[in-house]
Amino acid sequence: MNILSKIKIPEFCMSHWLLRIPLAIIFIQQGLMKIPVDIEEAASYGLSYLVWWFVAYGELLGGIGLVVGGLLNKPYLPILDRCYIPDIGDAITRFSGFTLGCIMTGVIWIGEPESLMDVILYDNLHVLLWVGALFFALRGNHAK
C-alpha cells in the first residue's frame, strides 16, 4: 500500500477565495479607472464608444459579481435562510467569469500578437487574468 494514501490531508474548502479576491480587486480597479467612459480613450484603442462602455462596466460588475457570487454560495446570516436560492450564487459567478474571460480575450486580441508564443511569453499577465476568469466561468462556486 502506498504510504501517501494513508495520510489524510485536510480539505480547505474556502481556498477559492485566494483566487477570487485578487482577481476581483484587479478587475474592479481596472473598471473604475475607465469610468467616466470617455470617447477619446476608446478611440485611442481603436474601439467604439459602445464597446468601451461594455468593457468598463463589464470589468467593474464582473469583479463585483465574483465576490457577490461567492458570498451567495451559502447563507452566512440566519436571516438569509428564508430567501436562499442555492444556484443563484453559482450562476452569478459563472456569468462574471464568462464576461471577464470575453473581455480578456479582447484585450489579448487588441495587442495584435504575432504568434501564440508571443502571448504566452510576453503577455503573461493578461493570460493569467484570462485563465482565472475561465476558471470561475467553468467551475463556478464548485471550486475547491
Write out the residue ranges for each language-model feature:
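Membrane-interface interhelical connector segments
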Residues: 35-49
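Extended, low-polarity transmembrane helix blocks
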Residues: 1-36, 51-144
